[in-house]
Amino acid sequence: MSKELSYDLVVVGGGPAGSSAAFAAAKKGIKVALIEKENCIAETVRTSGVTWIQNIKEFGIPDDCYNPIKNFSFCSPNNEVTISDSEARAAVLDVRKTYRWLATQAENEGVDIFVKTNINNVIKNNNGDIIGVKGT
C-alpha cells in the first residue's frame, strides 16, 4: 500500500545536521519531515567528543547530555599534552543523548519524524529539480 504525504521540506538523515536543519526550518514555519533509516534516532552512533561547556550552554544542550571534566590529555604517538583546571571548562558529550535531544527539539517545533524509513528514489520535475522522495 502506498501513502502520499506532503511537506515543504524533507530532510533525509536524523543525525545532528539533519535534526538541526529540520528544527531550524520548522521554527520558520516550514512543514518538515525528518526521515531516518534506523529504528530510532542515534541508534548507530559510533562517536564521542570533548567540547567546551560554554559552547554547550550556548546551544542550550541540557546538563544531562554531558559530563564536565577538569583534566584531560591530548595524546599522539610522539607527544602528550595535559590540561588541568580547578573549574570544569570542557565536557564529554553523551552524543547519543544529545542527538536524540536535537531530534526532540525538532519534533517539538512540529517536525514529523519517520524512523525505519529508507529513501530509495527521488522524484524530479522536468527541470531536474528534486520535488519529492519515495521510501519504504
Q: Can you name each region flagged by the protein language model?
A:
Residues 18-19:
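N-terminal Rossmann-fold NAD(P) dinucleotide-binding loop
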Residues 38-63:
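Conserved N-terminal glycine-rich FAD pyrophosphate-binding loop of Rossmann-like flavoproteins
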